[in-house]
């Protein structure tokens, strides 16, 4: 007892870290899986025998021939068809247009000239193809507009700040119409005959013509008395 160092009376103090003995856990209820034995099996329990059913392996066919689903003709054998020879009669072919082959009179051997005899090489200079150049719609020098050197439109030039002066806005000013009502000129003058005593009104018709017949009748000049050759006399009285 004399060799031990006296540290004083023990007093309760706060531990520096958590002590596992002070907490209650699940205990040995859970076990870690073992590294030996069967997979997904508790080693503390007996294990019954287990069997696995494998899949059926595919059948290997020695020959790939047609099965009963194909209908083989009855006269077909290994050496060919058994039976009498058979022939097919086709229809008459349609008449095709005759080939228009040029005759001897269509050829002009006298125009061959140097083609049939050895001659020096000859070259042909083709004219300038204006058709292709005409289709190229390329803008000319006058189609390009050179940017102005004034203002802020030149990218490579330093310009002073520019300001725009806008017109006076009616919003918030004394000219703003907050009521949105029409003025005196928006109303039309009402006819006083509507709300006052209406005076008598008369209508004047046009001049009326007496009724007359509009048929065209012959006048005195339409009759030729001198051309009458026979006239019926008066009827006698009985």
UniProtKB/Swiss-Prot annotation:
It is found in: Cell projection, Cilium, Flagellum. GO terms for cellular component: motile cilium. STPGR repeats lie at residues 182-207. Keywords: Cell projection, Cilium, Flagellum. Pfam families: SHIPPO-rpt. Residues 206-238 are annotated as: Disordered. Belongs to the CIMAP family. This is Ciliary microtubule associated protein 1B. The lineage of its organism: Eukaryota, Metazoa, Chordata, Craniata, Vertebrata. The gene is Cimap1b.
């Amino acid at each position: 007892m004399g060799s031990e160092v006296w540290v004083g009376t023990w007093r309760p103090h706060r531990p520096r870290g958590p002590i596992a003995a002070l907490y209650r856990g699940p205990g040995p209820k859970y076990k870690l899986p073992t590294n030996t034995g069967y997979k997904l099996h508790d080693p503390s329990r007996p294990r019954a025998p287990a069997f696995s059913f494998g899949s059926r392996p595919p059948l290997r066919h020695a020959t790939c021939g047609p099965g009963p689903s194909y209908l083989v003709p009855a006269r077909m054998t290994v050496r060919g068809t058994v039976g009498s020879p058979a022939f097919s009669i086709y229809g008459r072919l349609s008449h095709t247009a005759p080939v228009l082959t040029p005759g001897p009179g269509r050829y002009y051997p006298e125009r061959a000239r140097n083609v049939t005899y050895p001659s020096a090489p000859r070259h042909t200079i083709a004219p300038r193809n204006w058709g292709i150049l005409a289709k190229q719609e390329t803008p000319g020098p006058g189609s390009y507009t050179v940017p102005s050197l004034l203002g802020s439109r030149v990218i490579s030039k330093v310009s002073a700040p520019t300001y725009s002066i806008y017109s006076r806005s009616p919003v918030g000013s004394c000219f703003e119409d907050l009521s949105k009502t029409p003025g005196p000129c928006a109303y039309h003058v009402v006819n006083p005959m509507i709300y006052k005593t209406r005076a008598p009104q008369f209508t004047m018709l046009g001049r009326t013509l007496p009724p007359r017949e509009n048929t065209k009748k012959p006048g005195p000049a339409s009759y030729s008395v001198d051309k009458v050759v026979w006239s019926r006399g008066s009827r006698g009285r009985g």
